[in-house]
Amino acid sequence: MSISEDDAVYRQRVWREIDVHQKMNLPFTYKAFEDNGNQRFISILLNLIKSGEITAFDATADDRFTTPMTFKQIAEAMVGKPQVLSVPNFALDPDGSKGIMHDTTISQDFNPDQVERYEIKEEWVFDKESSRMHVRILGIAPLKSIYNSDGSFRDVTPIFWVYYPDMRPMLAKYEAYNGKNYGARMSWEELFESRMFASRVIKSTIDNPSDLFINGYIKDPILQLLEGDDMKEKIFNYEQDLWSY
């Protein structure tokens, strides 16, 4: 929905995190192959990027969709650059006694199961023309888990961003899995537009001049959730306060 700048009297941006392990988010993990390929959401994104139907943007630059990425750059962001190792050359030195070595390139394969979360960037706008609050998704980013040297979880970081408005026509062609009724499936566009996903708020523009994520100033996970809920409540209260006058 297009809202003119003059009619947009209130505007906030919100960043959310989707955990694919939550029951409501099971469609994101659906692995079946159908006529148009693998139906897992990360596979759909990668196939659309590889075919040139949508553009991926560098998540290390910003989240404003300014710096396009090549598919090679995406692959390196997901699994790292190939490593060149020096190993014994048993073809020329069968028993290894001569110490003849040769270089070999080791590449890691990308495992779609490693993408366990997604980040959503959205905008909440109050339209004075319709007297309604509207939400529109601006971007989606798959997140990669980062681990410490001892194997413990440290953080997540976006692999790349895709601009959602450009992607909507393509997502309308892919069906999202419905575990409750396989015959009543919806498209991925319908899933996002009807907000059929569970998420938590991880950042907003509300009272945030330093542009910090919640975990940047609140360390306790429970308090982070409460802070995110408070941000949502402030947005909803803006609309309710207008109706109370």
Place the predicted regions along the sequence by residue.
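Short linear, low-complexity motifs centered on an aromatic residue
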Residues: 150-166
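Extracytoplasmic
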Residues: 113-115, 135-137, 157-159
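Generic alpha-helical propensity signal that fires on short helical segments
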Residues: 138, 158, 178-182
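Extended serine/threonine-enriched, polar tracts that run as long, contiguous segments within proteins
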Residues: 132, 137-150, 154
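A domain-level signal for the mature, folded cores of soluble proteins
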Residues: 1-129, 147, 165-245
